[in-house]
Amino acid sequence: MRHSRDLIEIFGYAAGDNTEFARSLWRLGGCPFIGRGCVKFNHDKSVTYGTCSATSPYGDLVICPNRLYADNYAVIRRVAADAFGSDAPFYLFNQYVGRPPLSETCVVALGAHSGKEVRVGGSLSMDWVLVLLRDHRIVEYVGIEVQSIDITGNYRDAWHAYNRITFGSDPVTIPSSQHGLNWANVHKRLIPQLIRKGTVYASSSLVKRGMYFIVPDPVYRKFEELLGVMPERTEADHNTMTVYTYDLGPRMPFGETRALQPKRNDAFRS
């Protein structure tokens, strides 16, 4: 029987998934959503935890922003299509620099896994900046902030129990996880950062659609609890923040990853 506090996904698959490929990612420390090593370590980097999602009072909740990059950064591509239309080809940084684009107009994504994060106002960084290029010159751009939620406490015992599972092995006894969710950080850090970044972006003549915020739906609902009723949806302009929220899809058989399901699409002036 599953505990009320439990780990849901580790290295992209169900925590208890005993299929061969899922267990190989445990050995490699690999993240299937960004195609490289997981960045969730213990304090001395001797253990790679790979924890993508965990239980919460609001249902299964994404706790690593890289989990939101499933299906080859589909959430980022969705922003590009909304901001610049679906006709302009989309390139990650390595794709753009690796060969000349076939189109005179294209979108290039710059971020932590595609080139580097872009600095904002000298002291802040934006997770992603999508740049619309025409004849290799910048004509417009939008910023994207991607957030999940930090955890408190620890899930060490539960994680090590799941780690004992091997390919094809029988189920093992899993202790309850001792994690909590750092909702206070939403109020103290995330909201002020979004306000500051939105203000900086609104001042640029090359920003015509403000910035975008990608976040798990339960985290956004917590924003609403803290801030009250959000303004009515508005058409996008340079002062606008557009919010896309996502939930994890239904649990899948072992060997398959869960889909991300779009939930909210809000836009209001920041």
Model-found features: residue ranges?
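Extracellular-facing segments of soluble proteins and assemblies that are Gly/Ser/Thr-biased and enriched
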Residues: L102-Y141
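Short His-Asn-centered micro-motif
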Residues: L124, V131, V146-Q147, F213-P218
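Non-catalytic C-terminal interaction segments of nucleic acid-processing enzymes
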Residues: M1-G35, V39-F41, T166-S270
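Intrinsically disordered, low-complexity regions enriched in small/polar residues
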Residues: A15, Q95-G98, L130, G143, ...
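Nuclease-adjacent, charged terminal/linker segments that flank catalytic cores
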Residues: M1-V118, S270
